[in-house]
Amino acid sequence: MIVQVINGPNLGRLGRREPDVYGDTTHDQLAALIEAEAAALGLKAIVRQSDSEAELLDWIHGAADANQPVILNAGGLTHTSVALRDACAELSAPLIEVHISNVHAREEFRRHSYLSPVATGVIVGLGVQGYLLALRYLAGRPA
């Protein structure tokens, strides 16, 4: 099974941007962790990051067309993008929303997600391990 792992705005700055909040793992290191865990679980992870909402939408549409599960950390677009929510609603395979930090323990505006109502599940506040937990969940589901 192919799993699309999609990271949104500012996640390319992991390891440099607010390491006290997001940790010191870089996006390249995160991608390597995800790819290794996926392989160990018999999955193939395609890990991508973009600061462009349009590109994220294209990737979500592609996953919907291919009936592929998505692990999505939309960054700040989580709290603002109806367009991203609508694209995610089109997915028939599972959508796991992941956030590295505990968004519920931060600023008020971060506590609302347009994505959660259309997600299969949500993992928040467990650092980069949240991605690996999402993969383990998907590996346990029938293809």
Swiss-Prot record:
InterPro entries in the record: DHquinase_II, DHquinase_II_CS, DHquinase_II_sf
Alphabetical UniProt keywords: Amino-acid biosynthesis, Aromatic amino acid biosynthesis, Lyase
Pathway: Metabolic intermediate biosynthesis; chorismate biosynthesis; chorismate from D-erythrose 4-phosphate and phosphoenolpyruvate: step 3/7
Keyword Amino-acid biosynthesis: yes
Key word Lyase present: yes
GO biological process: amino acid biosynthetic process; aromatic amino acid family biosynthetic process; chorismate biosynthetic process; quinate catabolic process
Function text: Catalyzes a trans-dehydration via an enolate intermediate.
Assembly mode: Homododecamer.
Name used for this protein in its record: 3-dehydroquinate dehydratase
Species assigned in the record: Mycobacterium avium (strain 104)
